[in-house]
Amino acid sequence: MNSPRPTPPPFAAAAAGLPILVRASNLVTEADVTSLVWNKAPCRFCGTGCSVMVATRDGQVVATHGDIKAEVNRGINCVKGYFLSKIMYGSDRLTRPLLRMKDGKFDKQGEFQPISWEQAFDIMAEKFKAALKAKGPESVGMFGSGQWTVWEGYAANKLFKAGLRSNNIDPNARHCMASAVMGFMRSFGMDEPMGCYDDIEATDSFVLWGSNMAEMHPVLWSRVTDRRLSAPQVKVAVLSTFEHRSFELADLPMVFKPQTDLIILNYIANHIIESGAVNRDFVERHVRFAHGAEDIGYGLRPDDPLEKKAKNADKANTWSDIDFKAFAEFVKPYTLERTARESGVPAERLKALAELYADPKRKVVSFWTMGFNQHTRGVWANNLIYNIHLLTGKISEPGNSPFSLTGQPSACGTAREVGTFSHRLPADLVVTNPKHRETAEKIWKVPAGTIQEKVGFHAVQQSRMLKDGVLNVYWTQVSNNMQAGPNVMQEVLPGWRNPDNFVIVSDVYPTVSAQAADLILPSAMWVEKEGAFGNAERRTQFWHQLVKAPGEAKSDLWQLVEFSKRFTTDEVWPAELLAKAPELKGKTLYDVLFRNGQVDRFPASDLAKGYANDEVDAFGFYIQKGLFEEYAAFGRGHGHDLAPFDAYHEARGLRWPVVDGKETRWRYREGYDPYVSKGSGVQFYGYPDKKAIVFALPYEPPAEAPDQDYPFWLATGRVLEHWHTGSMTARVPELYKAVPDALVYMHPEDARQLKLRRGSEVKVVSRRGEIRARVETRGRNKPPQGLVFVPFFDANKLINKVTLDATDPISKQTDYKKCAVRIELLNLA
């Protein structure tokens, strides 16, 4: 079933010379080892936040290994981490700006030709200024990333929300963590987990909800496995819509019908109440109850019949207060019998799961990832798991924790904490709150009224607005939405190729997105720049620049800041705004945002000796330090405290809030969290009354389900060897050879009934599109009958041509786990 590495799609004369095979090699001999220089850095891949030691020689990364001093991974890596040294050296690395041209000038139908950075910024400025003049700030936008460094995301946020006055900036974390964000915000009034990875060694029970930790968070899974095999009382429950590698450790394996996790969660709450397992003292002191809006729609276009039918599509994130008695009545219909019947999970397993949570002598950690979050009711699923932990009081203490795991290295640190979502500002502030806008404007030293009140376009909406011609200039960095976005052919590609639009992609390789763009900017990656990530346990980690980027590639930070020099306030701010700050009139956005007396206050001499820093060389001051310290001002004294900049280069990361030099492992609990008042025990201080909310939320069906024409469920996701769209891992020969192609995992009986067999080539067809791939009936993923699983890493099998662009109406996060498809035979094999 292995196939040769496919030829990259045609990429223009300027990119000529791209070989068919992309190789990366860094063989190290014993004699070479003595000349290696080692430094620490967080891994470039997932949100676990492993630390690695990076070896450089002659200006190149030549080796990596797990950092034995790191608390997260304790010296080990997953298979992707072991090949980190090769991700930067694929032979099709982008090294020059490339513009679509014909007859020496830009042409949207032209071929890519190399240009200078000066020319690139010239046409970008021309397009941005024309759109802003013609249609205002709503016509420009940016799609960023949970892979941005902290200061890259912060600089982008400032440039768009303050400089260009457009809230149309959103990260690809919208696709992966937005439901977790809104779940935290609704239940606790603050974002991010209250626990930490130390819970793993302290708990008696692990419950995985829609999380294949064995492949997606393998280093954490090794810690879970060690705990399970070392302590006989420890139990592991795994819930998913299909069987995967995490089931190998499960004491309670449960495959449920798609969307019925909502029923199971409400059943557990009902069981806790009816069995007398409610922690009455905890609930009375620390919890209040609310009934959330129901029938809230599916985040589709407003003219979609499902949206027209929904009663509360415009009131999705609203609720009314109720009491405990009303909540108990609400969950009462979610009986064991009903739950077993509708979920397909045997009753005895459901009851055993409920008992894990109900037993007052047993500690429980709940882990979840995309199975919960990529869900049309993902926010509800998050709220419902918090309900269970709050009813039992199993929260905010060692071994008792509801824990949302992140998929990107800085989805927490950059997307969430920095606030690069279209509705957010740093440290949980939001653009719709006038006091929050005032705080940001004061810290940023811009006039009152600079930041717009209206929420910008979220990720899926950006694609729709590009298609509709509302959004006309679009810049993406560290993302590959043409492969990762939903419903690509109907809702993503049309907007990118709309002749009225201009699309810029900053990336390191010619991804599917890059090849659909008008202008490609070559970016520096990982240790080619100084950076900071924030992982899933609130741990902020720094690294130094260790090598130079190839050719003319530049960091995303340099691109953003240098581009800001192309605008003056007169060109982008209205006269009434400038009248409030006449001293800013005529200044560039670079002067206003980045030479503002705060960002530029740290001299180049503050840089640690012996390290390069291309941005310090370019701008003449320690811009990373200045951006970080300005950003940190948002959270200090408000429960989001970060340590001083220099502390992070010394440590293997620190978990916020960091107060008086001490990190916080468990939030909201007295004795661990410095923000909790003495004698209170627990304070959920995100809300003024310092109480968390338990939500009454029902089961509601998915946006699309199998029928006679499309009889299978489709779920998408990842595999161990590849990360997201494979733009890095597919260029590592060892990882590519291990898993060269995306496969259609299906039940053997389904294959037999369709007259297929393992290796058969099929079409996966939905109402939106189709792909070709081969069938796999054995191996790591074992779907139940009626469901197929296809990973999305393969650029030659774009499964997101098939997926539905339904989202959670509260979080606006896409549901990649549930749509209807049919399977058609092409070649039997």
From Swiss-Prot:
InterPro entries: Asp_de-COase-like_dom_sf (IPR009010), CT_Nitrate-R-NapA-like (IPR041957), MoPterin_dinucl-bd_dom (IPR006657), Mopterin_OxRdtase (IPR006656), Mopterin_OxRdtase_4Fe-4S_dom (IPR006963), MopterinOxRdtase_cofactor_BS (IPR027467), Periplasm_NO3_reductase_lsu (IPR010051), Prok_molybdopt-oxidoreductase (IPR050123). Binds 1 [4Fe-4S] cluster. Its main location: periplasm. Residues 36-92 form the 4Fe-4S Mo/W bis-MGD-type domain. Component of the periplasmic nitrate reductase NapAB complex composed of NapA and NapB. Catalytic subunit of the periplasmic nitrate reductase complex NapAB. Receives electrons from NapB and catalyzes the reduction of nitrate to nitrite. This is Periplasmic nitrate reductase. It comes from Pseudomonas aeruginosa (strain ATCC 15692 / DSM 22644 / CIP 104116 / JCM 14847 / LMG 12228 / 1C / PRS 101 / PAO1). The lineage of its organism: Bacteria, Pseudomonadati, Pseudomonadota, Gammaproteobacteria, Pseudomonadales.
